Amino acid sequence: MANYQILYWKDIPAQIRVFEGRKPISRQMPKRFQVEIDRTAMETGLAGTDDYLDQWQWTEKRERPGDPEDILNALVQELEAEYDDKVRKEKGL
């Protein structure tokens, strides 16, 4: 059993960290997520502002069974699929 947190900018996932004990392992989401964060920040006029920084939020720690590396890999896949579904719905696809 391990704990994990997800870092979001607004509703866009950016990074995941999984804790085994106190030591975390972490992974950034694929580059396309940072590209989307940057694009959205520019479009909304938040780039380079304190409001941009205020959009970064870690979730509360959640518990999940499994090996930390396996949890990390599974979460990346799940978040990619969830985000892709959200984008398709927004575009009416």
What would you call each of these model-derived segments?
Residues W9-D11, P30, D38, R62-P65, ...:
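N-terminal, helix-rich and Lys/Arg-enriched segments in bacterial and organellar proteins
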Residues G21-W58:
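Acidic, aromatic-enriched beta-alpha/helix-loop junctions
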Residues A47-L93:
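Acidic, low-complexity intrinsically disordered segments
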Residues M1-I25:
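Short, charged/polar N-terminal "headpieces" of proteins
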Residues A2, F19, K23, M42-T44, ...:
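Residue-level detector of functional hotspots within protein domains
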